């Protein structure tokens, strides 16, 4: 072909091969993933079957209309399938707006010392409940009672109207109660994909189903860019998000207990985690959060308990608590005014 007949405007194609040993944050940003043709984000043990291709236009040249339309339809359809499958689960669960968890007159002593005294509260389907109080108030003990690490001396715990007092922790997990503790989570030398895969392969034999599940979760929460990032290289907020996905990925979770999910995070990460928790609720989960900082989380809470010395001192929606002098006294002490 002579020079005159050659197209004047061409796309410059840059081919980047994935390197699992190097940082993959830049490689796997969303705009790069969108450029993968007809390929969902399904990885085989972090090994790409073919190099990713990023196309950069130097001068705008229209593509053939039919081809462009086809690609767009494929991408939109794939994204829609991933999102809709998960959202439908949440919508189905949220139809039941009654109580999913009921704690009635629970008491517990440890080493002869009363820790909890006649605690009662309930959690509705799709609700976010805040459990607040100073150190030693009994928040962790209450979490351990709900999840089944320890058993109450008196009182009753119900999940969907079924008494679960005597059920051990693994049976409560099978019924849909999961706890994410503050200092426990991922294998630091493993990527987000590997950490999720390690849990899922214990429950799912089909490799393709595992990869599809991982793709759905990461896509739904916009975390595809972390797929090849090792846990040790994640920010605090990213680490907690992947840790949470690890808890909910392999079972039908109904109640998720989060132990101080905002601890040691900067303001931007706190904002990101709060958005993440709201997205968990949209999936149909009911969430209980422990924290010391009422003002950091009050905007995402539906209801709140303030515990002091093993007793529920205040219960109510945050907008009511923040205006109540008695509540502020129990939470922040005397002499404090907002």
Where does each model-flagged region fall?
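Conserved structural motif at the start of ABC-family nucleotide-binding domains
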Residues: 101-103, 116
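The feature captures the beta-strand-to-loop junction immediately N-terminal to the Walker
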Residues: 132-134
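Helix-to-loop junction immediately C-terminal to a conserved catalytic motif
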Residues: 147
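Conserved ABC transporter NBD signature motif
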Residues: 155-163, 175
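Q-loop/switch helix immediately C-terminal to the Walker
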Residues: 183, 189-201
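Conserved ABC ATPase "signature" region
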Residues: 208-226
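Conserved ABC ATPase signature
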Residues: 230-234
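Catalytic Walker B motif of ABC-type/P-loop ATPase nucleotide-binding domains
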Residues: 256-260
């Amino acid at each position: 072909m002579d020079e005159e007949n050659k197209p004047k405007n061409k796309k410059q194609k840059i081919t980047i091969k994935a390197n699992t040993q190097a940082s993959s944050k830049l490689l796997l940003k969303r705009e790069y993933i969108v450029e993968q043709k007809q390929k969902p984000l399904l990885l085989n043990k972090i090994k790409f079957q073919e190099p990713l291709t990023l196309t950069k236009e130097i001068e705008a040249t229209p593509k053939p209309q039919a081809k462009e339309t086809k690609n767009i339809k494929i991408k939109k359809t794939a994204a829609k399938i991933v999102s809709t499958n998960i959202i439908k689960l949440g919508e189905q669960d949220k139809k039941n707006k009654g109580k999913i968890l009921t704690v009635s007159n629970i008491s517990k002593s440890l080493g002869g010392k009363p820790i909890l005294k006649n605690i009662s509260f309930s959690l509705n389907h799709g609700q976010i409940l805040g459990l607040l109080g100073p150190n030693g108030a009994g928040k962790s003990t209450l979490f351990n009672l709900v999840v089944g690490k320890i058993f109450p001396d008196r009182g009753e715990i119900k999940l969907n109207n079924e008494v679960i007092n005597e059920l051990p922790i693994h049976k409560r997990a099978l019924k849909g109660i999961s706890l994410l503790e503050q200092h426990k989570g991922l294998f630091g030398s493993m990527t987000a994909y590997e950490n999720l895969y390690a849990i899922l392969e214990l429950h799912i034999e089909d490799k393709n189903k595992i990869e599809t599940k991982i793709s759905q979760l990461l896509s739904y929460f916009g975390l595809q860019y972390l797929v090849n990032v090792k846990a040790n290289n994640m920010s605090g907020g990213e680490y907690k998000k992947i840790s949470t996905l690890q808890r909910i990925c392999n079972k039908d979770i109904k109640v998720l207990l989060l132990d101080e999910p905002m601890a040691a995070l900067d303001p931007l990460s706190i904002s990101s985690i709060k958005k993440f928790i709201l997205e968990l609720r949209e999936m149909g989960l009911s969430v209980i959060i422990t924290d010391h900082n009422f003002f950091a989380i009050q905007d995402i809470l539906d209801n709140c308990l303030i515990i002091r010395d093993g007793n529920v001192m205040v219960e109510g929606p945050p907008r009511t608590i923040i205006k109540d002098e008695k509540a502020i006294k129990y939470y922040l002490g005397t002499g404090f005014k907002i």
